[in-house]
Every structure is written in C-alpha cells, then in structure tokens.
Regions:
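N-terminal and secondary-structure boundary signal
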Residues: 1-163
Length: 163
C-alpha cells in the first residue's frame, strides 16, 4: 500500500443540494469534484474504494449514514471516468461479519446503490496489520482488506452535528 503526503488541491469543498433528488445529487457531485480539482483521469483503470459512513443499520431518511444516492452518483461518475472497479466498503460499528454487512448494506440503501451503479459491495471481513514506523504514538494499524487492496480511496462522510 502506498500513501502520499501531497497536499490536496482544495482541503474542503461543500456543495448544497436542497433535497435527495438524483439529478440534483449528480450535479452536486460534478460540482464538488470540480471544486476539488479532481480530474477523471486519476481513476482510469483503477480499483477505487468508496468509503461511506455506515455507522449502524439505519434507513437513509434517518440521516445517520451517508446517503445511498450520493454513493450511487459518485460510483456512476467513477465508471464514466473509466475506473476499472468501484467497491463500497466500511467497517461499521458492531459485528464485522458478512451477515452484519449484508443487513447494513440493505437497510442503509447501499445494496440498491451498488445494483444501480455496478459498484461492488465488500463482504471480505479480513484485515491486514500495517506499520507506520515514523508515527509518534500508534505504530501499527489494522486495515480492512478492501482498503489495502484499493488503488484509490474516496472517503465520503456524513456531515452531522452532535449536541
């Protein structure tokens, strides 16, 4: 696994969509990638991991997890950019088993997003320990297989507020 210390072109970009409408989300994704100055050529022929926030088994309307329309739109964009494969993977809270992942993907809408976009859902629950010898405190990390095996990783969080 290779990492890079290069600085992003734009550290943060926010794009508003007034509702979860597929056309609005598609336009928002296009604009977001444009603001971040991310060229489609980066993804050509690559195995790309989309890492949503799938904290727990919740319906999209509960606004706990990354919305599946956003993941579908991003996967569609990646395939238009000629990504070789798009994988949806996370290590949610609770049990990390194929059965638990199946339930979370179904409830959170990721199964439908994958079916509609052609993305692949991860059911590999293995991990690899990687070293970070120059780290100050934690020098080893357990990373799930799809993270280690991906050429590129796009982390797509869920913007939340907590009291």
């Amino acid at each position: 696994m290779q990492t890079t210390n290069s600085k992003p072109f734009a550290p943060v970009a926010l794009v508003q969509a007034q509702q979860y409408d597929p056309a609005l989300i598609d336009r928002a994704v296009e604009r977001l990638l444009e603001l971040l100055n991310i060229p489609g050529e980066w993804f050509c022929g690559k195995r790309v991991l989309i890492k949503p926030n799938l904290l727990m088994r919740r319906q999209p309307q509960e606004a706990t997890t990354t919305h599946p329309l956003l993941i579908k739109s991003l996967a569609d964009w990646l395939y238009r950019a000629k990504a070789a494969q798009v994988i949806i993977a996370d290590s949610p809270g609770g049990l990390y088993t194929p059965a638990a992942l199946r339930g979370i993907y179904q409830t959170c809408g990721m199964q439908q997003a994958a079916e509609q976009s052609g993305a692949v859902l991860n059911f590999d629950v293995g991990y690899r320990t990687v070293s970070a010898k120059d780290a100050c405190i934690c020098r080893e990390f357990n990373l799930i297989h799809p993270v280690v095996q991906a050429d590129l990783i796009l982390s797509v969080g869920k913007l939340k507020t907590h009291c």
